[in-house]
C-alpha cells in the first residue's frame, strides 16, 4: 500500500503493508524527500507473543508487514542526501514499541552497507494515538 504526492519538487511517499521488499520497491522509494515507512513488529516479540500461529505466519509472510529489521534494511537502500524526513509507522501494539522500532532501525542503518549513518537523517516514530508533528520540507 502506498500513497505518494509531489508538490514544488518535494516527493513523499507512504509505504505500509509491504511484507517484503524488492528492487521495484527500492526503485519507487529511492528519490524521496520524505517517507513514512512501516516498522510493524519485532520478530522475537511476534514469535513469543499472543497471536495465533496462522496470524504470525501471515504477518511474517510476503503479504504481511515489515519487521523493524527489514524496515532498517530498506532505509539503507533508499538513503540519499535529499532525504529530509523518515517517519516510522504502522507499529503493532502487541509486537513492538516505539523505542525498540527506533533503535532497531538505527542499528540496521549504522551496520548497513551504506555511506550514511542513522544520525545523518531525522528519524521519528509516529504515535499510535496522537497526531505527529508537522514536517516542513
Predicted regions and their residues:
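Single conserved hydrophobic/aromatic residue that forms the stacking wall/gate
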Residues: 1-11
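Short active-site-adjacent helix-start/loop capping segments
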Residues: 10, 96, 133-134
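Active-site-proximal beta-strand elements of phosphoester/diester hydrolases
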Residues: 12-18
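Cofactor-binding loop segments of dinucleotide-utilizing enzymes, especially the Rossmann-like FAD-
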Residues: 17, 91, 128
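Cap/insert and terminal regions of metallo-dependent hydrolase folds
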Residues: 23-124
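Short, basic/aromatic-enriched C-terminal tail that caps enzymatic domains
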Residues: 121-137
